[in-house]
């Protein structure tokens, strides 16, 4: 068995919190982070997280049960705070005995943290913290751990880089709280750096998206293998009247068409041929179903290929266990050379 003693020592608190061998979380990726990938990551010593996304409570119940058939190791469930059935989803997690619930996509609504921690099977709550002030508020509100995620990440992103957020937050919070760092991590060297800064662990998504165990379409994986860091771009907002939530994804015909669509709708607005609400809905609904088209159907030209800037380090399909072993070895080598 490989000796990762230096990395293990720095990860000890995070691994204990997660109940896993390594304090390496897999970021929840819609359509990708399902039973196969999640169980594979937990079985390999990491910590898998089911992406609930827009699932109904019934679908989530099935997904958790199927994941539990594939692993007896701990895993988490990522819930979107704006989901209309959030509290029903929390009940599903509680009934299934899920050990950790990750709340993403906004500030947790009133009573949600209490519901997760106060059920028949109390779970630990992990939240995302985009600023130091919000981080402190979330911890006061009962969050057990925080994820600091920078703009290098794939999917929905904030405006500040991982390295800056880590420098702002870890000195203030890492000693007394469990903090994970995410966004742009593709190699163990970076992981080692954040652990030395006080992080209890890390979260990676893009690095695991093309694992052998990932159900993503072969063409989706090939698009990742071809891509460089500069191909993973944040969505562009053309007009302030038509708000666009920043999302990082691989540029393709779909992203180009989206920019044209915004310009077209803005022009119609200028000519007063459409109501503001209808115009905003057209923009909001443009990407409906686009993630599924990319991940499941393999439509890499028109679908949404959410990817972080670390995509340039993803060059081949590898088993999850090999990816985790590489990350740990790279971290250990970096720490040994200090």
Q: What does each model-identified segment do?
A:
Residues 151-152, 183-185:
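Acidic, glycine-rich active-site loops and adjacent beta-strand->loop/helix elements
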């Amino acid at each position: 068995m490989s000796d990762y003693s230096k990395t293990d020592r720095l990860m000890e608190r995070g691994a204990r919190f997660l109940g896993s061998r390594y304090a390496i979380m897999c970021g929840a990726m819609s359509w990708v982070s399902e039973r196969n990938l999640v169980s594979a990551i937990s079985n390999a010593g990491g910590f898998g997280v089911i992406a609930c996304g827009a699932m109904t409570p019934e679908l989530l119940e099935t997904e958790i049960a199927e994941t539990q058939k594939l692993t007896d190791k701990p895993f988490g469930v990522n819930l979107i705070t704006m989901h209309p059935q959030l509290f029903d989803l929390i009940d599903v997690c509680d009934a299934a005995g899920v050990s950790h619930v990750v709340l993403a996509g906004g500030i947790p609504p009133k009573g949600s943290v209490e519901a997760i921690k106060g059920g028949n099977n109390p779970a630990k709550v992990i939240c995302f913290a985009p600023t130091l002030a919000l981080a402190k508020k979330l911890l006061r509100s009962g969050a057990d751990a925080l994820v600091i995620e920078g703009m290098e990440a794939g999917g929905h992103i904030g405006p500040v880089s991982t390295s800056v957020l880590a420098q702002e937050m870890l000195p203030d919070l890492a000693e007394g709280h469990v903090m994970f760092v995410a966004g742009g991590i593709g190699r163990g060297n970076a992981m080692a750096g954040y652990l030395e800064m006080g992080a209890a662990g890390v979260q990676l998504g893009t690095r695991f998206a093309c694992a052998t165990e990932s159900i993503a379409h072969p063409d989706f994986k090939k698009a990742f293998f071809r891509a460089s860091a500069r191909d993973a771009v944040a969505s562009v907002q053309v007009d302030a009247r038509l708000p666009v939530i920043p999302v990082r994804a691989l540029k393709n015909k779909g992203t180009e068409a989206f920019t044209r669509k915004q310009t077209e709708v803005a022009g119609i607005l200028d000519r007063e041929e459409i109501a503001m609400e209808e115009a905003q809905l057209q923009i909001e609904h443009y990407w409906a179903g686009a993630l599924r088209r990319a991940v499941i159907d393999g439509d890499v030209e028109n679908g949404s290929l959410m990817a972080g800037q670390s995509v340039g380090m993803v060059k081949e399909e590898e088993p999850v266990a090999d990816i985790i072993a590489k990350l740990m070895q790279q971290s250990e080598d970096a720490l040994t050379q200090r």
